[in-house]
Curated annotation (Swiss-Prot):
Ranges of biased composition (kind: Low complexity): 18-29
Disulfide bonds: none
Protein name: Protamine-2
InterPro entries: PRM2
Positions of region (Disordered): 1-103
Keywords: Chromosome, Developmental protein, Differentiation, DNA condensation, DNA-binding, Nucleosome core, Nucleus, Phosphoprotein, Spermatogenesis
Gene Ontology molecular function, alphabetical: DNA binding
Family: Belongs to the protamine P2 family.
Tissue/organ expression: Testis.
Length: 103
């Protein structure tokens, strides 16, 4: 009985304190949500932008320019070497593979 009373007494202040803290947390949650949302958004944007940025960097100016140059030179010879080398190295880009296969 005493243990039960001790538990109830210990639970009640936690409940009351929890309600107060929860009430304060609700006030803080508005601020924390605003504080956490930008953090989550930043992390999400970092991961999202990071992947898209890598994709853009892999296939953007330099690579496409090199591909165009190689096409004009001799695509068949360069195509085999470059595609194999790219696949081994960075697994190549789909656009590059498609363009190499087409030409």
């Amino acid at each position: 009985m005493v243990r039960y009373r001790m538990r109830s007494l210990s639970e009640r202040p936690h409940e009351v304190h929890g309600q107060q803290v929860h009430g304060q947390d609700q006030g803080h949650n508005g601020q924390e949500e605003q504080g956490l949302n930008p953090e989550h958004v930043e992390v999400y944007e970092r991961t999202h932008r990071g992947h898209s940025h890598h994709r853009r960097r892999r296939c953007s100016r330099r690579r496409l320019h090199r591909i165009h140059r190689r096409r004009h030179r001799s695509c068949r010879r360069r195509r085999r070497r470059s595609c194999r080398h790219r696949r081994r190295h960075r697994r190549g880009c789909r656009t590059r593979r498609r363009r190499c296969r087409r030409h």
